[in-house]
Amino acid sequence: MKEGRPHIDNPLKWAISGKICCNGLFTDIGTGLEQTSEVNLKTRRVVKIDGKNCGSQSALGHHLSALWVTPSMDRLFAEGAAGRRRFVDRLVVGLDPEHAARVTEYESCMRGRNKLLKEGAYNKEWLSSLEETMVTSGVALTASRMGMIEKLNKITREQYGVFPAAELGMMGKLEGWLFDVPAIEVEDKYRASLLDSRQYDCHS
């Protein structure tokens, strides 16, 4: 791993690079700040893989991932489920970078649906389109979360010792359905559930 030093004329310039070996194949990766303006010292993030510029830093997720727990997260298992789901999402993204896009897509469509329902007068085709995206993205991301939980449970079961192994699980409507029926049937059930709950959700 090689770390570049800041330039004296512009301390904002910075870069770090390294060589990763996976299954005997080496990949050069690097990231840093590149100056875009001589006038106001503006910079932008640059990511390179094997010497080629990448469109975004998400490309790094196809080669490596990192996860950490900070002191501010020590209430993770004592507070609401939303924070724990976000933490599981970070674990999933470490193995499947596309998961982040599915989460963003689902949350964006959910907010759009809630807004349309609260406004009262809405285009039914547009509302159905938002719900359809919620169905496909929601079931897919829930299945990915459950898959990650099962991976963690498998690891804890393989640990030998006198200390009891932790058993993790996720509880929710989609999670419960996915335990019982195939994903395609869960999509049908979720689609019908969203349709049936429109009247209730517009007042919630």
Where are these regions (language model features)?
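Nucleotide-state sensing region of NTPase/ATPase domains
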Residues: 2-83, 89-99, 153-158, 186
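Long, non-coiled-coil amphipathic alpha-helical linker/lever segments
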Residues: 88, 95-145
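Aromatic-residue detector
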Residues: 1, 11, 61, 65, ...
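Short phosphate-engaging motifs
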Residues: 83-84, 148
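Generic serine detector
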Residues: 10, 17, 37, 56-58, ...
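Conserved NTPase motor "head" modules and their coupling/switch loops across ABC/AAA+ ATPases, GTPases
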Residues: 4-5, 122-204
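Short, surface-exposed, polar/charged, turn-prone segments marking secondary-structure boundaries
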Residues: 75-76, 94-98, 104-106, 196-200
